[in-house]
A protein has these predicted regions:
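Conserved N-terminal structural module of periplasmic/extracytoplasmic solute-binding proteins
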Residues: 2-100, 112-118, 162, 283, ...
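Short helix-initiation/N-cap motifs at beta->coil->alpha
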Residues: 64-73, 92, 167-173, 248-261
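Hinge/lid segment of periplasmic solute-binding proteins
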Residues: 92-145, 288, 365, 372
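Short, solvent-exposed loop/beta-turn-alpha elements that line the ligand-binding surface or hinge
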Residues: 107-121, 165, 187-193, 211-232, ...
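C-terminal lobe and pocket-closing loops
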Residues: 111, 274-284, 296-303, 309-395
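Extracytoplasmic/periplasmic solute-binding protein
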Residues: 132-141, 146, 170-222, 229, ...
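Glycine-centered hinge/linker elements that transmit conformational signals in sensory
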Residues: 175-176, 219-249
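Extracytoplasmic/periplasmic substrate-binding proteins
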Residues: 201-208, 235-319
């Protein structure tokens, strides 16, 4: 499941601490019931319900929440003092809510090593859930990977190797140029997700090729920078967009999955969760999933996890921790084996996900291989801004960087305007 991008988190973060709590109906007490809320699909929730019902010693109740209205419902529950004992949250939500004092600090529970062990989380995943002071206000759960879905027939026709672990940025750009030459009327690389052409995507290119990241540290940054390698990466991408070799940052990728599954494009950028949608469309060609390209200096792969958070006024942290710990291993192993949506940041909980993929076809196995590779790579880049200025920074990117990358404004001027605009927000 992709991370939640709803802006209603701002409504939640603006509430006073007094408005947050488990509530008498939702709060778990010793021997009572622990409540939680997800944004997952009906099928995934049903699979999770079956597994969570097996937990002994404490009751578990999932609160209903329509996927599309999740953030709004969460805000309403906090306002009415009926927030569940734990709830699905994105990394950016967690950082913003924690900054307002609205979340429970799980640091002491993780330190005990009872239920979950710190060294069993995938590299770097826990660090993004700690605030600048090192407190842990959320536990990472479902991990997203991002990469390139490819149509093998199109690559074979153009006499190109299919993308695979270890391919490079130079190969990516050479491939889409060759694919464009083979079929001038088509756009070879289509974005079903905006990350590739975002500042973070360009930052990944920069770091992989020996440059600096756009933010020095993912949490607690007070400025962004765009060095010469970042600008060189942006220039390469802008040229590819102008040549019609890839879609622009504002492209609406709503129909991209269906088009890819029907053989309408050689390459589609997106997350591993699109696997199920592609499969449901029953493609009649060989396809697979490859990770981000390597640069001249290193391979840098994305790190992004969703997680669970609890209200600061949590009534029963002992039993809540017990439920979360059970879910991270048994709950997710059983659920993801039935509904293979994502690997789990807590590595012992990913067994079911990988078993489901390895039992599938070659495409499913390629997704398993890419997910394993991306999660295990040491060098990572963060897929979004996480600091409190992150939401308005998105507006700055949309009016400065995106038009410049699309060729509507001078590129370096657009980058400079983005840097200046975000740094002004970060300085407040």
């Amino acid at each position: 499941m992709p991370k939640l991008r709803a802006t209603a988190v701002l409504v939640v973060a603006g509430l006073a601490l007094a408005g947050c709590g488990g509530g008498s109906d939702a709060g778990g007490k010793s021997g009572g019931t622990i409540s939680y809320m997800t944004w997952e699909s009906v099928a995934t929730n049903a699979a999770l319900d079956k597994s969570m019902a097996k937990l002994q010693g404490v009751g578990v109740k999932r609160e209903e929440s329509p996927n599309a209205d999740y953030a709004q419902k969460l805000a309403s529950l906090i306002m009415s003092k009926k927030a569940p004992d734990f709830f699905w949250c994105s990394n950016s939500q967690e950082q913003n809510l924690a900054a307002e004092g609205l979340l429970y600090d799980w640091s002491s529970y993780l330190k005990k090593g009872d239920g979950l062990q710190e060294d069993k989380f995938s590299p770097g995943s826990l660090d993004l859930w700690r605030n600048p002071e090192g407190k842990l206000y959320g536990i990472p759960t479902l991990a997203n990977t991002y990469g390139f879905f490819y149509n093998k027939a199109d690559f074979d026709k153009a006499k190109l190797k299919t993308p695979a672990i270890g391919w490079t940025w130079d190969e990516l750009y050479a491939d889409i140029a060759a694919l464009k030459h083979a079929n001038p009327k088509a756009t070879p690389l289509v974005n079903a997700w905006a990350l590739l052409e975002s500042p973070q995507g360009i930052s990944a290119y920069s770091v992989a090729n020996g440059g600096a990241p756009i933010v020095e540290k993912p949490i607690g940054s007070k400025e962004v920078k765009a060095d010469a390698t970042f600008r060189a990466g942006a220039e390469k991408m802008a040229k590819a967009i102008k040549a019609g070799e890839m879609t622009n940052p504002d492209y609406d990728g709503t129909n991209a999955v269906a088009q890819f599954a029907n053989g309408g494009m050689p390459l589609m950028f997106g997350g591993q969760w699109l696997h199920q949608s592609i499969t449901q469309n029953k493609p009649k060609f060989e396809w697979g999933y490859a990770p981000w390209p390597a640069g001249t200096a290193k391979s840098v792969q994305p790190i992004e996890t969703n997680g669970v958070c609890s209200p600061a006024t949590l009534n029963d942290p002992d039993n809540t921790w017990k439920v979360i710990s059970y879910m991270e291993v048994t709950g997710f192993n059983e659920t993801m084996k039935e509904q293979p949506i994502a690997p789990i940041a807590y590595e012992p909980g990913s067994k079911g996900y990988y078993e489901a993929l390895q039992a599938g076809d070659a495409a499913a196995k390629s997704i398993a291989a890419t997910a394993t590779y991306e999660l295990g790579v040491k060098d990572k880049f963060v897929t979004q801004f996480l600091d409190p200025w992150s939401t308005p920074a998105g507006d700055v990117v949309g009016t400065t960087f995106n038009p410049a990358l699309s060729g509507k404004k001078e590129l370096n001027a657009g980058i400079d305007a983005m840097v200046a605009g975000i740094n002004k927000l970060a300085a407040k």
